[in-house]
Amino acid sequence: LIMQELEKQFHIHCVEGDVGRYVILPGDPGRCESIAALFDDAHHVAQNREYNIYTGTLLGEKVSVCSTGIGGPSASIAMEELHNIGADTFIRTGTCGGIDLNVQSGDIVVATGAIRFEHTSMEYAPIEYPAVANLDITVALRQAALAMGKTTHTGVVQCKDAFYGQHSPAKMPVSYELLQKWEAWKRLGVKASEMESAALFVVADALKCRCGSCFHVIWNQEREAAGLDQKMSEDTSSAVRVAVDALKLIIEQDRAAKK
């Protein structure tokens, strides 16, 4: 018992054997139970702070889901501690806000890379280092989304630390910087904005892990500003199913490659 307590990860309260090699990472602890319901033989493992963990199987392979909370700091903690006890393949699934005018509410965005407009990743790699998703996972996510018939956008997402820095930039003392950079993201064709992928991609590279991300588009403030059709879409079940189906593809690929 004493040894088990010593080995327990500080934040996620898990020990080696509690989680699988493959982990889905939502932000919201409240989504973990419904994600675990898509596994076989799922059971609850632990919950502490923003971290809610379930483990089950997919295609006979041990898999887990662990929520990360909001933003890079808590997401990086989850990845670090999960990696400490054996995880090496991660899929972030969650929500985003569209930026590119072609990205509409209810669509799926698969991130190929992320703008490091956050600071967690700075403690892992210099700013010149890109935050890039694992190619195999990215391809699997896109394949899974298209197989579901979802309108799918693949490209770069923007990651920030301050939610209201995006949504209320004019009131911020550094509004001049926020607004100018937002205009740059638009002109560069950035697909959407969210808060975790840049940190997760860089941390995964530092740990020699694999990570990809897919998102459900809730809203696109740029479409609203342009007077285009726009509605709120809060049902994230499609993005969750995309992540689970993609994980099955990765498991099959790993078996074929004997990874």
Regions found by a protein language model. Give the residues of each.
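Zn-dependent metallopeptidase/amidohydrolase metal-coordination segment
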Residues: 198-232
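Metabolite-binding pocket within alpha/beta catalytic cores that recognizes anionic/polar moieties
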Residues: 2-140
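Flexible, glycine/charged-enriched surface loops at secondary-structure junctions
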Residues: 42-47, 149-156, 252-259
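His/Asp/Glu-rich mid-to-C-terminal helical/loop segments that flank catalytic regions of hydrolases
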Residues: 221-259
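Generic non-transmembrane alpha-helical segments
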Residues: 140-148, 203, 242-253
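Active-site rim beta-loop-alpha module in soluble metabolic enzymes
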Residues: 131-189
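Short acidic/polar active-site loop segments enriched in Thr and Asp
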Residues: 88-89, 191, 210
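Glycine-rich beta-alpha junction loops
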Residues: 29, 97, 158-164, 199, ...
